[in-house]
C-alpha cells in the first residue's frame, strides 16, 4: 500500500493520551479538508496535543496527565480507569474503534507499528485520505453523502 504524506493518522503527535487517533476525528479532518467552505458549521481542531490543551476527554480529570507523569493513559497504574472505559465503550459501540485497544497495541508493538496499522485500516481506497472514525466517510471523496445527511454515521440514517 502506498503511504501518502498527507495521511493524518501517521503522526505520533495526533495520538492523544486516551488512545484516540485525532487524525481520524471529524473536527481534525473537517479542518484539514475545510468542510465549512462547503456549507458546514463545524468546530475545527488541530488535535489534542497540537492545540496545547492536553487530552480533551481527560483534561482536568487526571493528575498524572496534568503533571506530565504519563504520556499515555496506558502508562498509569489505574489503566484503564472508569472514565476511559466509558469513553472506550461509546467509541466501540458508535464508531468502530477502541481507545483501550489502541493503547494496548502501542504498548505491545510500538508507535511505528501502530501508525502503520492505522494507515492500513483507515485509508480511503479511492484517494488514500483518512476515513473519519465518527461517520465512516472519507471527507475528500464522500463529502456529498454528509451534505445530504449531516447526521450520517456509518451507514445508519
Each PLM stretch: what is its role?
Residues 45, 59, 73, 124-127, ...:
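Short cysteine-rich clusters marking metal-coordination/redox-active sites
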Residues 34-42, 86-112:
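Short, surface-exposed polybasic-and-hydrophobic patches located at secondary-structure transitions
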Residues 26, 49, 63-66, 77-80, ...:
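Cys/His-coordinated zinc-binding microdomains
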Residues 31, 54-55, 82, 133-134, ...:
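Short, non-ligating residues that shape and space the ligands of small metal-coordination modules
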Residues 142-152:
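Short Cys/His-rich micro-motifs in 6-15 aa windows
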Residues 11, 33-36, 44-48, 79, ...:
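Charge-rich, low-complexity N-terminal segments
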Residues 9-16, 34-40, 50-54, 65-67, ...:
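Short, flexible, mixed-charge glycine/proline-rich loop motifs
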Residues 2-7, 23-32, 56-60, 103-111, ...:
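Short Cys/His-rich Zn2+-coordinating modules
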Amino acid at each position: 500500500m502506498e503511504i501518502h504524506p498527507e495521511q493524518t493518522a501517521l503522526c505520533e503527535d495526533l495520538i492523544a493520551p486516551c488512545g484516540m487517533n485525532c487524525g481520524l476525528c471529524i473536527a481534525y479532518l473537517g479542518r484539514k479538508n475545510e468542510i465549512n467552505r462547503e456549507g458546514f458549521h463545524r468546530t475545527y481542531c488541530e488535535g489534542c496535543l497540537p492545540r496545547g490543551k492536553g487530552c480533551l476527554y481527560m483534561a482536568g480529570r487526571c493528575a498524572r496527565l496534568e503533571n506530565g507523569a504519563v504520556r499515555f493513559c496506558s502508562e498509569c497504574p489505574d489503566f484503564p480507569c472508569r472514565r476511559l472505559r466509558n469513553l472506550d465503550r461509546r467509541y466501540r459501540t458508535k464508531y468502530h474503534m477502541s481507545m483501550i485497544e489502541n493503547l494496548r497495541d502501542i504498548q505491545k508493538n510500538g508507535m511505528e507499528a501502530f501508525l502503520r496499522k492505522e494507515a492500513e485500516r483507515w485509508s480511503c481506497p479511492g484517494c488514500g485520505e483518512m476515513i473519519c472514525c465518527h461517520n465512516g466517510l472519507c471527507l475528500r471523496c464522500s463529502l456529498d453523502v454528509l451534505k445530504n445527511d449531516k447526521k450520517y454515521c456509518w451507514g445508519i440514517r
